[in-house]
């Protein structure tokens, strides 16, 4: 076709050189390069081509079917950022997934994404929380009869697979879990009343003088602290005691570990710690705690036992099926006495168990009526502190209802009782012993309750309710709730007591969801 101006037609298509300089050419060239590269990678090499082809054929023949299974696991949560897969953080699921791949239970093609395998957990545990038993459901290659042992070979000692059971394709371990058992280990010295002259001790004393709603006199705790006072009087002069009480740690640059005053303070704390660990709970004190825990049985509105939930939110109603508190037992070189609390509930909200334990323990510490707990289910907002995560562990999910359907389908039921002996041994070595040791090394529970005993700041709104301010939305501190006779604790406290105490040693982190207040106390462990 003519392209000169005389014809009235101008060729608007670029020439070869102009085309090669354009963006479209560069993009097309890049695509061709990618195509050629892929084609080259797929083409068997000319040398040893028979081996390459044979290898490809063998890989296709070795491809095995995936089966939907329930994997029963146990783990120690220390050192992990919880159960749920959350890269780049180190989690339990990340360890399990890697072990599945290394053992051949998950193919390399499916080793990059949990979703490809239908990964789901029955109960998500938070940072530092352990599980004697938990269940995950996913698709695995289980043709190898020794697959469980191979998986365990690739797992650290603190994570174990108890069993692998075939389930039907519709199985969802979280949705079909009928209920869950949790256990909480608590040192009995947590039940001792607050140390004399702390804010909480003065508040209880003030309530004891009130005409109504006063707590019972806690003679057991008074005798305990009187015995400690006598031991201190024998060890230190009054001048030394005053210096110890008023001791303020110097800056790191000025700190002298060999100073006489610091050594006195250290001796005093060691005496107090040893005296506390020698405590043995009385039957009356333990009975009060057991009665407090019984208040949780049945369906209740637990909106005060979690975060961000309103009284009218229907999801806050939870059903507790059974609660047991063991007899006291003594563990470890320090001869600390403990109790085990087991809670069986249909489901639990964030922090719920730790707040339940905290409330019941404070009932015992304040020696007030266990029936106060029943009033926490009402619309009044209460700021309940979380007990340390250290003592919490998931005992096991329960599939009582769904196990009947599994039997009908010809599958084995999901029952942790088949592995109870192995689980008990594992818990003693990898969970219980670590809990006991960490409590002794860090004084976790002592730091937590000392912080509450000393902190007097009322959280939430203060002042008289107005027409535009619902009194139920005025957030009470846990102390104001348990001891309503202390109507104005700030007015009755000394100037020194009104100062917020220092955070327990070893904890300087405050999460966004847990403000540093009198009742949301930072602990040395994270949530459960």
UniProtKB/Swiss-Prot annotation:
SUPFAM superfamilies (UniProt xref) = Pseudouridine synthase (SSF55120)
Q: Does the keyword Ubl conjugation apply?
A: no
A single GO cellular-component term from the record reads:
nucleus
Which BP terms from GO are recorded? mRNA processing; mRNA pseudouridine synthesis; snRNA pseudouridine synthesis; tRNA pseudouridine synthesis
The record's GO molecular-function terms, alphabetically, read:
metal ion binding; pseudouridine synthase activity; RNA binding; snRNA pseudouridine synthase activity; tRNA pseudouridine synthase activity
Cross-referenced Gene3D superfamilies? Pseudouridine synthase I, catalytic domain, C-terminal subdomain, Pseudouridine synthase I, catalytic domain, N-terminal subdomain
The cofactor note from the UniProt entry for this protein is:
Binds 1 zinc ion per subunit.
Q: Which residues form the signal peptide?
A: none
Where in the sequence does UniProt note compositional bias of the Basic and acidic residues kind? 31-46
Catalysed reactions, as listed in the record: a uridine in tRNA = a pseudouridine in tRNA; uridine in snRNA = pseudouridine in snRNA; a uridine in mRNA = a pseudouridine in mRNA
Q: What is its EC number?
A: 5.4.99.-
Location of this chain's protein in the cell: Nucleus
What ranges does the record give for the region Disordered, renumbered to this chain?
1-59, 486-528
| Top-level class of the enzyme under EC nomenclature | isomerase
Q: Which family does it belong to?
A: Belongs to the tRNA pseudouridine synthase TruA family.
Protein name, UniProt field: tRNA pseudouridine synthase 1
Q: Which organism is it from?
A: Eremothecium gossypii (strain ATCC 10895 / CBS 109.51 / FGSC 9923 / NRRL Y-1056) (Yeast)
